[in-house]
Amino acid sequence: MSGSDTSGSVHVDEHGHGHGKASSSYDGAGAPAPAPAPFQGHRKAGSGSSDVPFLLRSGGSGGDGLRRCLGLIDFVLRVAAFGPTLAAAISIGTSDERLSVFTNYFQFRARFDDFPAFEFFIVANAIAAGYMVLSLPFSAATIMSSKATGVKLLLLICDTIMVGLLTAAASAAAAMVYVAHEGNLRANWVPICLQFHGFCQRTSGAVIASFLAVFVLMVLIVMAAFTMPRRTHHTAS
């Protein structure tokens, strides 16, 4: 057959690089359009946590955000407990009232150093107030790092010691305040609050403030025990 159809002619590379390769004149006619590149956001990988508040970031563990929130509450409660302990120590330390009978040369006096229980109360509350201030940096460390197990354990032990110290001091002072208000007929102790109103008001308020600090410390102990990380034991399969 002498007829030649040029529509399907094969072009060969002139320089010999196209041996065995043929290109049809219709190569680009039915080529599909390139798929659009997937949309890439401006946010880099791993930067999605920047929009999450610091206290709620999990950091790879679901309970870390909750532990940071409880750490912040721990810090606030320590600041709040500093006030009652300091106020209780100052209130008892400045309690001094004199009662004049007939003349100024014959006086009765009610002062805190007349009662050893009140002296112990002042020392215990002063120690507790100082401890609250010193524990604030450690409490802040538990907020920044929820895995600070050693710091949490140290605070838990010291808080327990402070609870025992404050409870003993507040209980001893409360017993003295009760006797001052009610007296003891069997021991022939008369109530002195009928005459020394200011002294009894100061001591009563100080005891209430100290018990309030004890309650705050007990809450701190419960929170510390709740946020303490627990070890999981894996059994061999």
UniProtKB/Swiss-Prot annotation:
Keyword presence, NAD: no
Keyword Membrane listed: yes
Domain of life assignment: Eukaryota
Membrane topology of the entry: Multi-pass membrane protein
Stretch list, region Disordered: 1-48
Record organism: Oryza sativa subsp. japonica (Rice)
Any single GO BP term: cell-cell junction assembly
Main location: membrane
Name listed for the protein in its UniProt record: Casparian strip membrane protein 2
Self-association state and partner proteins as the record states: Homodimer and heterodimers.
Keywords from the named record: Cell membrane, Cell wall biogenesis/degradation, Membrane, Transmembrane, Transmembrane helix
Segments on the Cytoplasmic face: 1-69, 139-152, 227-237
Ranges that cross the membrane: 70-90, 118-138, 153-173, 206-226
